[in-house]
Amino acid sequence: MAASPIRRFSQPAVTATIATARLELGLFALVLGVGLLALRTDFGYDGQMMYKVTESLALRHSFQVQDPAWHANEPYAYFGLGVSLLLLPFYGLGALLTGDGTRLIVLYGPLVTALTAWVLFRLLRELGASASRAVAIALIFAFGTLAWHYSTTIFSEPLVALGVTAAIYWLRVYQRDPRRRWLLAAGVATAITLLARWDSVLLIAAPLAVYAVYQIVRARRLSPAVAGLFTFGAPLAAALAANLWYDWLRYGNVFTITTKNALEGSFTTPIWTGLYGLLLSPGAGLIIYVPVLLASAVSLRGFYRQARPEAVLLLSLLALRLLFYARWSSWDGREWGPRYLLPLLPVLLVPLICLPAQRWIRIGTFVLAAVGIGVELLGQLVPYDTTVWPTTAPLVVSTLQLHDAAGSTCLCSWFVDAAASTAMDFDIHFAPLTRQVTLLLQGTVDPSWRAAWPMRGFLLALAAAIAVLLWRSAHRAWFTELYAGPTGSL
């Protein structure tokens, strides 16, 4: 399959010109603004527990919390510290300005997503993409993938996505400019993923460490390898020590990383069931929720030819995560779409910089991106946590006559809850997207959107216009760079 004619990856000088700075600021502001349009934060169970740790630290200087729902997070939450610590400034500022620490928590998710889109843009430029293509891919990430939905939630996965994208970006910068400051930045970004989730030791830190060693060895003539390894590894060691200390505090043993209650079922899902569920199932399949990844897969061959180390890293990250979570009993993450695959969404879009030049592929990519944006807009209009799950789960229980061993049909039963989730994952009639379309046709819309739909509709249209203007501005900037001196951009 032929690739676009311009495909050389030179050493692109990503300079802080006024035009580039304006473009980056515009991208960040647009993603942040649209993310804040919903003005809501659906905490979910995970988010509630992580927020409770934040609240306990702020009010009582303690890590202990209460879990009235499942009692699985008492007296300590089994989630990572990363999100809870990052929520502290929002809680403190909210308490200071409004007297309510929860008020400004709504800023956290959109801010993380906007930062991720910005870092993704810089990574794409560092890999040689033109400004216009980098803007387009960053906007697809922000509004055509699950990132939009998860910007209105409190989960650890968006933070991991930011960390892994930033780490790859800074390691790639180090390839061009072998100064240890970039290794330190990459190490800090990787350490953030460790603080957010323990599984990042295997799923994120290990592949990134191999990639970092590769970059350091390549630059050994200009920078001592041992010093470089120490610079990258020091933040990881600090994060690992913090996690081990937190485990000792919670469980009295640094070798215990969770509680028995948190492991209900553990790695019991048949591997092929989990893989089908994560990738293709009607209720939680990645391709169903993010169809533009099909175009990314088509582009992978060209990307592998032009950036083999990054392509191998991407495939390693994906393979590890798929194999790990395909066996997990709650592989779907009990949320909208495959939550556990969210951390890789930014980097999975990177191969699009090598999108083949055939017209039908370009048109197909545009259509897939538009479908993805439509899916995300549907997720905003008919939210999963406040509308879809509360109406669909009871319907599943009554239709399929689900009950636990004691005969209870209550969704407060772990067995009934899991069985309802499984039905929504694999039965297209109960799949979230099917139900969202049905509910939308019945006139069921999120109250905040129903009450302010003219204004929000106008703001969305304005955001779309700004996105087009950003792309056109980036396109003009690329031509300016081209005539000033070719850099091998894509």
Spans of features found by a protein language model:
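Membrane-interface transmembrane helices that cradle and orient dolichyl/undecaprenyl
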Residues: G128, E157, A167-L183, A219, ...
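Hydrophobic, aromatic-rich transmembrane alpha-helices
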Residues: R218, I287-V312, L348-L355, R362-A370, ...
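Perimembrane helix-loop-helix junctions
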Residues: V173-P178, L203-L240, A297-A307, V350
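Membrane-lumen/periplasm interface segments of specific transmembrane helices
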Residues: R40, Y214, V226-S299, L314-Y325, ...
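Short helix- or helix-capping micro-motifs
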Residues: F28-L32, A134-T145, T165-Y169, A186, ...
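Short hydrophobic alpha-helices at membrane interfaces in multi-pass membrane enzymes
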Residues: V135, V173-A191, V226-A227
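Transmembrane-helix motifs of polytopic, lipid-linked glycan transferases
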Residues: L104-G128, L162, A166
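Start-transfer (signal-anchor) and selected internal transmembrane alpha helices
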Residues: M1-L36, R125, I216, S223-P235, ...
